[in-house]
Amino acid sequence: MAPNLRKSHPLLKMINNSLIDLPTPSNISAWWNFGSLLGICLTTQILTGLLLAMHYTADTTLAFSSVAHTCRNVQYGWLIRNLHANGASFFFICIYLHIGRGFYYGSYLYKETWNTGIILLLTLMATAFVGYVLPWGQMSFWGATVITNLFSAIPYIGQTLVEWAWGGFSVDNPTLTRFFALHFLLPFMIAGLTLIHLTFLHESGSNNPLGIVANSDKIPFHPYYSTKDTLGFALMLLPLTTLALFSPNLLGDPENFTPANPLVTPPHIKPEWYFLFAYAILRSIPNKLGGVLALAASVLILFLIPLLHKSKQRTMTFRPLSQLLFWTLVANLTILTWIGSQPVEHPFIIIGQLASLTYFTILLILFPLIGTLENKMLNH
């Protein structure tokens, strides 16, 4: 029998083992599509970003104009920019759904895969933040000022750290140039981390909705899941292009159509929608250092999730009480997102504080408690 190049060639063999002949559980649902969708998001963002970088000038006097020039004078520049800006939103939608899936189905018990995933999330958040500064509009400038300023809350070294990050005594040209350098670099770091993430995943194989070992009933990834993924691509790229073509500025802030002006502060400084939940938690504590710690904890708490798993069952498929708690957490995050977009006044302050408290309570206290309770219920 002639040797199969796909299985013998050193490079093709790797692709084959991870995308073609990969043994996959036969019962994974559409919730397992988001990993590949994130891959498509990353590819799209790198391609559109590369094309934008060719026309962008990282200088405070030219940045805003260079973005306007791209949209007005470059062939399909407006489309490239709209796809890139809204592609970021879809990236976050996919990653949040992907994390939610992992949480619901107990995928976090693959600890290495989960932890590399959290590092990927943090890198993505950093990339989105530095990218938002590049158009050098009002919200770009003031967002950069407010968020980088948070580091000054770190005792003793805080102020020095912030001035070192800024490259001066305020957000200015050095800040913009280094943010552009970082925004160019980080997506490639994300691509590298993704390979590590997949390496760890393929050590154990995919989890499945029942949370049981599926080795006895696995099917090849291609053609089954390659086809299913292609449908997922179409279902994501369709709303992305629709948004980019019909209402590209729907998720943006009108303030960013005004060039950055250090002398005029916008009435409401707020980040893009995908950071609002964390922003609400930051603002809910009336102390700078406390707020910064809560902000960090809101994402870093994900590292603790595997340690807080007390149930005898892996997934929530057959755990109605945990399901109820899970959807309460989703509702809670929705409330936090809404609060983050509101001004700091009554009743939003108290709602934000209660929602922040509830967020940490559900994750740190209620989930382990309910898991233990469900174990006891299994015995009766």
UniProtKB/Swiss-Prot annotation:
The subcellular localization recorded is:
Mitochondrion inner membrane
- Tell me the superkingdom of the source: Eukaryota
Q: Which GO terms describe its biological process?
A: mitochondrial electron transport, ubiquinol to cytochrome c
GO terms for cellular component: mitochondrial inner membrane; respiratory chain complex III
Q: Where are the transmembrane segments?
A: 34-54, 78-99, 114-134, 179-199, 227-247, 289-309, 321-341, 348-368
Residues given in the record as heme b b562 binding sites: H84, H183
Cofactor dependence is on: heme b
On cofactor binding, the record's note says: Binds 2 heme b groups non-covalently.
Spell out the PROSITE patterns in the cross-references.
Answer: CYTB_CTER, CYTB_NTER
Q: Does the keyword rRNA processing apply?
A: no
- The residues that the entry says bind a ubiquinone are H202
Iron is among the record's keywords: yes
One protein family per Pfam: Cytochrome_B
Which sites bind heme b b566?
A: H98, H197
Recorded topology in the membrane: Multi-pass membrane protein
List GO molecular-function terms, semicolon-separated.
Answer: metal ion binding; ubiquinol-cytochrome-c reductase activity
Note, other:
Heme 1 (or BL or b562) is low-potential and absorbs at about 562 nm, and heme 2 (or BH or b566) is high-potential and absorbs at about 566 nm.
Functional description taken from the UniProt entry: Component of the ubiquinol-cytochrome c reductase complex (complex III or cytochrome b-c1 complex) that is part of the mitochondrial respiratory chain. The b-c1 complex mediates electron transfer from ubiquinol to cytochrome c. Contributes to the generation of a proton gradient across the mitochondrial membrane that is then used for ATP synthesis.
Family recorded in the similarity comment = Belongs to the cytochrome b family.
Describe its partners and assembly state.
The cytochrome bc1 complex contains 11 subunits: 3 respiratory subunits (MT-CYB, CYC1 and UQCRFS1), 2 core proteins (UQCRC1 and UQCRC2) and 6 low-molecular weight proteins (UQCRH/QCR6, UQCRB/QCR7, UQCRQ/QCR8, UQCR10/QCR9, UQCR11/QCR10 and a cleavage product of UQCRFS1). This cytochrome bc1 complex then forms a dimer.
Protein name per Swiss-Prot or TrEMBL: Cytochrome b
